[in-house]
Amino acid sequence: MRCPFCATDDTKVVDSRLTADGYQIRRRRECPVCKERFTTFESAELLIPHIVKNNGSREPFDERKLRTSLSRALEKRPVSTDDVEQAIHRIVLQLQATGEREVASKFVGDLVLGELKSLDKVAYIRFASVYLSFDDVEEFSKEIERLRN
């Protein structure tokens, strides 16, 4: 790695350790020319797959869209912002863990349903009514029954 002080091409790693969250490596480096020390952080670049929509179009994953959908379903429900952020984090991790370049929007919707089911049943039904495109009250009732069991 290039020294930020004197631009020497090669520096020496003096110390390496994991950060507290365990997702990064903190490296303490020293330049052999100017003797300055500096810290770098290294983390894996995990790619989030593109989303293939029902009509076949593709778009990059948008965390804001996910947050908006969850917030809309959870509106006026007793669920903390921290719980919502953790749910988003779990969904993103599951998307990264697929290792795929593309996933169907249905896969993302199913992940959201799973998170909402454990967070708040009313929010789950709100999201499901739009996501599963209930055509009539009967389908709505069946989903509520499934949720009870």
Curated annotation (Swiss-Prot):
Does the record carry Kinase as a key word? no
Q: Which family does it belong to?
A: Belongs to the NrdR family.
- A Pfam family of the record is Zn_ribbon_NrdR
Q: How is the cofactor bound?
A: Binds 1 zinc ion.
Zn-finger segments (unnamed)? 3-34
Listed cofactors: Zn(2+)
UniProt GO BP: negative regulation of DNA-templated transcription
| Molecular function terms from GO | ATP binding; DNA binding; zinc ion binding
Q: Which UniProt keywords apply?
A: ATP-binding, DNA-binding, Metal-binding, Nucleotide-binding, Repressor, Transcription, Transcription regulation, Zinc, Zinc-finger
Q: Domain (ATP-cone): give its ranges.
A: 49-139
User: Any idea what this protein is called?
Assistant: Transcriptional repressor NrdR
User: PANTHER family this protein is in?
Assistant: TRANSCRIPTIONAL REPRESSOR NRDR
Q: What does this protein do?
A: Negatively regulates transcription of bacterial ribonucleotide reductase nrd genes and operons by binding to NrdR-boxes.
What organism, scientifically named, is this protein from?
Glaesserella parasuis serovar 5 (strain SH0165) (Haemophilus parasuis)
User: According to the UniProt record, which cysteines are disulfide-bonded?
Assistant: none
| InterPro entries referenced in this protein's UniProt entry, alphabetically | ATP-cone_dom, NrdR-like_N, RNR_NrdR-like
Q: What is the lineage of its organism?
A: Bacteria, Pseudomonadati, Pseudomonadota, Gammaproteobacteria, Pasteurellales
